[in-house]
Regions:
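Amphipathic alpha-helical segments used for helix-helix packing
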Residues: 100-118, 171
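Short hydrophobic/aromatic patch on the recognition helix
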Residues: 41-52
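Basic, helix-initiating cap at the start of DNA-binding domains
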Residues: 1-27, 31-43, 57-60
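Alpha-helical DNA-contacting segments of helix-turn-helix folds
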Residues: 60-66
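C-terminal peripheral helix-coil segments that are non-catalytic and often amphipathic
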Residues: 1-3, 90-101, 130-143, 159-161, ...
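Short coil/turn segments at alpha/beta junctions that flank glycine-rich nucleotide-binding fingerprints
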Residues: 26-30, 81, 102, 143-144
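Amphipathic alpha-helical packing segments from all-alpha helical-bundle domains
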Residues: 68-71, 118-143, 152-156, 180
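Hydrophobic alpha-helical connector segments
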Residues: 61, 75-101, 154-158
């Protein structure tokens, strides 16, 4: 059965994103030659330009894909508990572990902000992991689990703390230990928001 044009288009987009993700995570954005990328994807430069405009547009699509996968992982791992407090901590752990994974670290932490600029990188974060965090905190506050405070302020505070923690974890020679220490520290921080 022949694929529709829409299916062919989606397949082309996904092939370019997956090929670029592999190369960007291994080589970095700057060191990834466009010719090799499109060749490895079995595409032409024209296909890349048609769907993404340029290499930076493709990188943005890769970053959004990484952010979406991390948000799904957060929700999946947090749903392992019915307890809202435990869900928050599980979600924080999932974010930090996913952010420092070998296939995400360079794209998310290094090239994301430098290639796209802080504002664009921040917006993609707000549309994915931060949104998941904000939703969880809002539910917890509505149910009286958190002290009364601005959910937006709490979201930015926790997100900033975790973003800084993942930079530290990524540079650590003992990543697993650094992850555990960061989860313990985030848990202590969150305890300060817990209603009595």
């Amino acid at each position: 059965m022949r694929r529709s044009k829409a299916e062919q288009k989606q397949e082309t987009i996904q092939t370019l994103i997956q090929t670029a993700r592999t190369q960007f995570s291994e080589l970095g954005y700057a060191a990834t030659p466009l010719e090799k990328l499109v060749s490895d994807a079995g595409m032409t430069r024209g296909a890349l330009y048609h769907h993404f405009g340029n290499k930076e547009g493709l990188f943005l699509a890769v970053l959004q894909s990484v952010q979406q996968e991390i948000a799904v992982r957060i929700e999946s791992e947090a749903s392992g508990s019915d307890d809202l407090w435990e869900q928050l901590i599980l979600g924080c752990r999932a974010f930090m572990a996913a952010a420092v994974a070998d296939n995400n670290r360079r794209i998310l932490l290094i090239d994301g902000p430098s290639v796209l600029g802080w504002d664009v990188w921040r917006r993609t974060d707000e549309q994915h992991a931060m949104m998941t965090l904000r939703d969880q905190l809002q539910i917890m506050q509505t149910q009286g689990i958190l002290k009364h405070a601005s959910v937006d302020a709490l979201t930015h505070l926790l997100s900033g703390a975790m973003n800084e923690a993942v930079l530290w974890i990524a540079e650590s020679s003992e990543r697993q230990q650094a992850l555990e220490e960061s989860v313990a520290a985030i848990t202590l921080l969150c305890e300060g928001f817990r209603a009595d």
